[in-house]
């Protein structure tokens, strides 16, 4: 990452922190949503629950039944994924910049 490209930080009224880093060398946008929950938050008897919850997004939502979000992203030439670690769970979508609204609708 180029350290000369600034990162703008905004905290919304609901407490959500938004970080924005604009790079204009390609017509794409990548949207990441980070949650401060991971395996360190689990207790005996529910280990793996953070990763399980991560995978539930891929099972569908009220707006995107199972399989529809992946099809919509693929139609636009994008990709998405998620990951769980010790202290975070994150989801991301990378799409043509003019279609970033699709990523915002699922999150």
Which positions does each model-derived feature cover?
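Catalytic zinc-binding patch centered on the HExxH motif and its immediate surroundings
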Residues: 22, 81-84
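Short, solvent-exposed loop/turn segments at the edges of secondary structure
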Residues: 26-28, 75, 86-88
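N-terminal Rossmann-like or analogous alpha/beta NTP/dinucleotide-binding catalytic cores
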Residues: 75-80, 102
């Amino acid at each position: 990452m180029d350290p000369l490209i600034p990162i703008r930080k905004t905290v919304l009224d609901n407490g959500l922190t938004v970080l924005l880093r604009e790079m204009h060398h390609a017509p794409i946008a990548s949207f990441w949503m980070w949650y401060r929950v991971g395996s360190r938050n689990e207790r005996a008897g529910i280990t793996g629950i953070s990763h399980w919850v991560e995978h539930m997004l891929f099972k569908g939502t009220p707006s995107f039944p199972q399989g529809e979000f992946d099809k919509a992203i693929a139609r636009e030439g994008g990709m998405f994924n998620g990951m769980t670690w010790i202290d975070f769970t994150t989801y991301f979508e990378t799409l043509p910049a003019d279609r970033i609204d699709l990523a915002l609708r699922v999150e």
